Amino acid sequence: MSTEAKAASAPVVAAARRTWVLPLVLTVPGLGFLSVRFFEATHEGIANARSNACRALSPDPVPAALLNREAPDFQLPDASGKMVSLSSQRGHPVLVNFWATWCPPCVEEVPSMEDLARRLEKTDIRMMAVSVDDSWDAVRQFFVKGTKMGVLLDLSKNVPKSFGTEKYPESFMIDASGHVRHYFINKRDWSKPEAIACLESLR
């Protein structure tokens, strides 16, 4: 190519390069914006799904005395005699369930509670199944094959009273900061996938 031809083609090449560079410059920030919006939309979608999961479990209104307040702390023995407190679970979502072996709806609820407990084993979510039976013998006879439910025994029956519980079963979902967020009167099917999704929203 002659010197004159090269000189003539130079503006064309430069213009072509500018044509490619301009969309690229405009596209990079655009991709960043789209990435942020995608993240926000995904995060919002997950939050909505978990909120819907909680509603699917049909929670009852949180008692006024507990609404937006820290759950009453308690310390009770497990089957080995070790004392376990609610406050020691801080930083984890917790499902507190008040029940008894002599309570028919509680007994009906236990299989789904067991199913949930097994699925929670490898998560940071805790379950505290507080029995108001009169002795460990009754609880041990009930769970002949053992249990994953994290059973504690309250011989005084004062802990349920501190939560305002008068009938069994009743359950409270407590968030990682120790506040009661959801309340359930009577039995629920805790084997539903919504149960874990709802608890996950309390991290």
Predicted regions mapped to residue ranges:
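Short, internal strand/loop/helix patches
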Residues: 128-130, 140-177, 185
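Conserved redox-active cysteine motifs that mediate thiol-disulfide chemistry
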Residues: 90, 98-115
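Thiol-/selenol-based redox modules, centered on thioredoxin-like
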Residues: 49-52, 173-203
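A structural alpha-helix within SAM-dependent methyltransferase catalytic domains
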Residues: 114-118, 200
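A short beta-strand-turn-helix
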Residues: 65-68, 73-94
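N-terminal targeting signals for export/organelle localization
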Residues: 1-70
